[in-house]
C-alpha cells in the first residue's frame, strides 16, 4: 500500500486539477487559498474560520477571496491580449461581466473597481458590465466606469429602454440588445422622445449550440434572439427610421459552461457569417459579443464532461478571434471589438462554502452471530454464503447474497419474519458485503459493477450543517458537481468513505457525485470524526450563480459571509460582508407577524401556569430561538 503523502492528498481530492492554482494543501495538511495563483501567498481556510468565529460569525460560512476576482479577470484579459498580438488583431477586446452570475456588491462591485485596460494599444483588453433586468441595470449604472461598455440584455419595457438611453448621455457606452422583434419599435419611439441616438445590438439565434446542461440558452429553440428573417426585418425597420447607423453590435450565446472547444469554434464561425453579411448591407458593426460559454473545470477531469472543459483561456481566446480576423482580412472589413460575457470564469473560484459535520451515521458493518435452532431458511442460506467467502468467486457470492436478502425482505413484509430475524438478515448481508469488497479489484473488469455498487452502498452518511437548496442549488437542480475537500487533517489518510446529506427534511438534500482522483465517484474519502473536534469541509468553486439561485427550503436562510483581502504584506484582512439570516427574518419573509408570534408565545406560557422563574426562562428561550441563526449552533445551551 502506498504511504499517504500530501501529494496523494492533492491527487485524491483533485486539488491541482480543478483549482487552477487558487487552492493547495500546505505542509500541515491544511487546505489553503492562493488568491494570486501558484506564486502568491497562501491562506489557510482553518485560520480564516477561526478569525471569523472571533468576529462572531458562525458556520456554515461563505468565504470570498476577493483578490481572486481581479486575478481571474486579469488572466482572461491577458489571454485575449496575447491572442490579439499573435493574430495582429487590432479591434480590441472587452471582458464584460454579466452581473446575473453574482450580483452581490462584494463581487460585482469588486470587479468594477479592479476592472481596467490590460495590454498596450492596439492590443488592449478592457472591462465592462452587463445587465439583464431593470434592477441589474440600476446597479450597473452606479458601478460602471465612465466611457465603459454596458450591455443591456434581457426583455425590455419602455422604462428599461429609457434608462439605458439616458445612461448614454451620462457618458456610458450603453448598447441595447434587441432580444425580440417588438423591442425594435420601442427603441425607435423612446430614442425620438428623448432625442438620444441609440446604439443597438442584435441577438442572433444561432443554429450552433454547445452540448451540456445549459444548452437551451443557444440554438433554434433558444428563449432569446432573432431568427435570420427577424434579423433582416429589424435592420430594415431601423434603417427605415433613419437609425441604420445605430446597428453597432451583434450578440450571440451558445450556452453556459461549454465543455468542448469545437462547439465554440462552430458557433463563432456561424456568427462571423452574420457579421460579414450585415456589414455588406450597410450596418456599421463595431462590436461582436460572443456572450457566455467559457467554462471552468469543476471536476478537474479536463474533458468534455458537462462540468469540465477540454481547453484553457489561451485556446478559448484564439478560437474566438481567429475566424473574425480571417473574415475581416478576406472581405476588407474593419475589425470589430470582441466582447465576451464570461462571468462564470471570472467568479467561480473566488468563493468557498465552509461547513461543519454535525453527525456521522456509519455504514452497517454487519456481524455474524451463532446460529440459532429453527432459523428461517433464508437466514441459513446467508450463513452458507458467508461460510464460502474464501472459496467461491466474490461476484457470484454477492449476487447470491442479494437474492437471499430480497427474499427475506419480502417475507418480512408478509409478516413471515420477525423484526429480530429481519435485523439478523441485514447483519449477515452486510458482513458478506464487506468481505466481498475486500476481494474485489478495480483492475478486474468483471468486478467493477459490483465494486461500484458496494462503494455506493457501504458508505457513511455525513450529516452536514447547511442546506443544499440554499448554498449549492445547482447540485439539486441540474446535478452540477462541486469539489469538496476537508479543511484540515489532509496529512492524515482518510479511513472512511462517505456521502454528504444536509439539514433539510428533503431526500433531495444530498450530494450524489464527488470529485476524486481526476474522476467522479459516488462517495468521497473522509476522515473519522475525533471526539471533541469539529470536522470542517470546504465546498469549493461556488462563486457563480449559487448565491442568488439559492432558495429558503425549510426556512434555512443566507449564511454568514466574510471577505478575505490580501494586505500586501503577506497577511490578510477579514471583512464582514453579511450576517446570515435569523429565524425572525425568515418568518417575516413568509408572512408571519413577529409581534403576533411573541404574543402567542407569551399567552401559551401564561396558560401553562408555570412558576414565574420557569416562565421567564421559557420566554427567554423562545426569544433566543426566534432571533437566532437558522442553522445548527455549535455552542452549548446555558
Where are the regions that the model predicts?
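Charged (often Lys/Glu-rich) extended helix/loop segments that serve as interaction or gating elements
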Residues: 4, 325-638
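Short, glycine-/Ser/Thr-/acidic-enriched flexible segments
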Residues: 30, 38, 68, 102-104, ...
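Low-complexity, highly charged intrinsically disordered N-terminal segments
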Residues: 20, 25-103
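Flexible, glycine/charged-enriched surface loops at secondary-structure junctions
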Residues: 59, 63, 85-90, 281-285, ...
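Noncatalytic alpha-helical scaffold of FAD-dependent oxidoreductases
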Residues: 75, 119, 315-322, 332, ...
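Charged, compositionally biased N-terminal leader segments and the immediate start
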Residues: 1-31
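C-terminal helical cap(s) of enzyme catalytic domains, especially alpha/beta-barrels
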Residues: 304-313, 317, 355-357, 372-376
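Active-site-proximal beta-alpha core segment in soluble small-molecule metabolic enzymes
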Residues: 88-289, 294-299, 310-318, 323, ...
Amino acid at each position: 500500500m502506498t504511504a499517504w503523502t500530501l501529494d496523494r492528498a492533492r491527487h485524491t481530492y483533485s486539488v491541482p486539477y480543478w483549482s487552477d492554482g487558487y487552492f493547495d494543501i500546505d505542509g500541515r495538511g491544511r487546505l489553503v487559498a492562493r488568491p494570486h495563483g501558484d506564486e502568491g501567498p497562501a491562506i489557510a481556510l482553518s485560520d480564516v474560520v477561526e478569525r471569523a468565529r472571533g468576529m462572531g460569525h458562525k458556520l456554515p460560512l461563505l468565504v470570498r477571496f476577493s483578490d481572486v476576482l481581479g486575478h481571474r479577470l486579469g488572466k482572461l484579459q491577458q489571454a485575449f491580449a496575447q491572442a490579439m498580438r499573435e493574430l495582429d488583431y487590432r479591434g480590441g477586446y472587452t471582458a464584460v461581466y454579466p452581473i446575473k452570475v453574482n450580483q452581490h456588491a462584494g463581487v460585482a462591485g469588486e470587479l468594477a473597481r479592479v476592472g481596467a485596460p490590460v495590454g498596450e494599444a492596439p492590443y488592449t483588453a478592457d472591462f465592462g458590465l452587463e445587465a439583464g433586468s431593470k434592477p441589474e441595470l440600476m446597479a450597473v449604472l452606479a458601478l460602471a466606469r465612465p466611457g465603459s461598455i454596458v450591455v443591456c440584455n434581457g426583455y425590455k419595457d419602455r422604462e428599461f429602454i429609457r434608462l439605458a438611453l439616458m445612461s448614454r448621455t451620462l457618458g456610458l457606452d450603453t448598447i441595447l440588445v434587441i432580444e425580440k422583434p417588438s423591442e425594435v419599435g420601442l427603441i425607435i419611439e423612446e430614442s425620438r422622445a428623448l432625442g438620444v441616438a441609440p446604439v443597438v445590438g442584435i441577438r442572433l439565434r444561432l443554429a450552433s449550440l454547445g452540448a451540456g446542461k445549459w444548452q437551451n440558452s443557444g440554438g433554434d429553440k433558444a428563449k432569446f434572439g432573432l431568427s435570420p428573417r427577424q434579423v433582416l426585418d429589424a435592420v430594415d425597420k431601423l434603417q427605415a427610421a433613419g437609425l441604420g447607423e445605430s446597428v453597432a453590435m451583434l450578440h450571440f450565446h451558445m450556452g453556459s459552461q461549454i465543455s468542448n472547444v469545437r462547439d465554440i469554434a462552430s458557433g463563432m464561425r456561424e456568427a462571423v457569417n452574420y457579421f460579414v453579411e450585415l456589414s455588406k448591407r450597410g450596418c456599421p458593426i463595431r462590436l461582436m459579443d460572443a456572450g457566455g460559454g467559457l467554462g471552468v473545470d469543476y471536476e478537474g477531469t479536463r474533458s468534455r464532461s458537462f462540468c469540465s472543459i477540454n481547453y484553457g483561456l489561451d485556446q478559448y481566446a484564439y478560437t474566438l478571434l481567429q475566424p473574425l480576423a480571417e473574415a475581416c482580412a478576406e472581405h476588407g472589413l474593419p475589425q470589430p471589438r470582441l466582447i465576451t460575457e464570461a462571468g462564470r470564469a471570472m467568479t467561480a473560484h473566488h468563493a468557498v462554502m465552509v461547513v461543519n459535520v454535525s453527525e456521522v451515521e456509519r455504514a452497517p458493518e454487519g456481524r455474524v452471530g451463532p446460529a440459532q435452532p429453527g432459523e428461517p431458511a433464508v437466514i441459513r442460506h446467508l450463513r452458507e454464503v458467508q461460510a464460502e467467502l474464501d472459496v467461491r468467486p466474490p461476484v457470484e457470492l454477492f449476487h447470491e447474497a442479494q437474492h437471499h436478502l430480497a427474499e427475506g425482505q419480502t417475507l418480512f413484509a408478509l409478516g413471515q419474519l420477525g423484526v429480530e430475524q429481519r435485523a439478523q438478515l441485514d447483519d449477515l448481508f452486510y458482513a458478506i458485503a464487506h468481505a466481498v469488497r475486500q476481494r474485489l479489484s478495480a483492475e478486474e473488469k468483471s468486478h467493477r459493477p459490483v465494486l461500484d455498487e458496494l462503494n455506493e452502498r457501504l458508505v457513511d452518511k455525513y450529516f452536514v450543517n447547511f442546506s443544499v437548496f440554499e448554498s449549492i442549488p445547482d447540485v439539486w437542480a441540474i446535478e452540477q458537481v462541486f469539489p469538496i475537500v476537508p479543511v484540515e487533517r489532509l496529512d492524515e489518510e482518510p479511513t472512511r468513505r462517505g456521502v454528504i446529506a444536509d439539514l433539510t427534511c428533503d431526500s433531495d438534500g444530498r450530494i450524489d457525485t464527488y470529485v476524486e482522483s481526476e474522476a467522479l465517484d459516488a462517495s468521497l474519502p473522509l476522515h473519522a470524526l475525533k471526539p471533541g473536534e469539529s470536522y470542517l469541509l470546504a465546498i469549493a468553486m461556488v462563486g457563480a450563480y449559487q448565491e442568488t439561485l439559492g432558495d429558503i427550503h425549510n426556512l434555512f436562510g443566507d449564511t454568514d459571509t466574510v471577505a478575505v483581502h490580501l494586505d500586501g504584506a503577506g497577511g490578510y484582512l477579514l471583512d464582514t460582508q453579511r450576517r446570515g439570516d435569523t429565524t425572525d427574518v425568515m418568518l417575516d419573509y413568509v408572512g408571519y407577524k413577529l409581534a403576533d408570534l411573541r404574543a402567542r408565545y407569551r399567552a401559551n406560557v401564561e396558560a401553562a401556569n408555570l412558576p414565574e422563574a420557569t416562565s421567564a426562562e421559557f420566554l427567554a428561550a423562545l426569544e433566543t430561538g426566534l432571533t437566532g441563526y437558522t442553522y445548527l449552533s455549535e455552542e452549548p445551551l446555558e
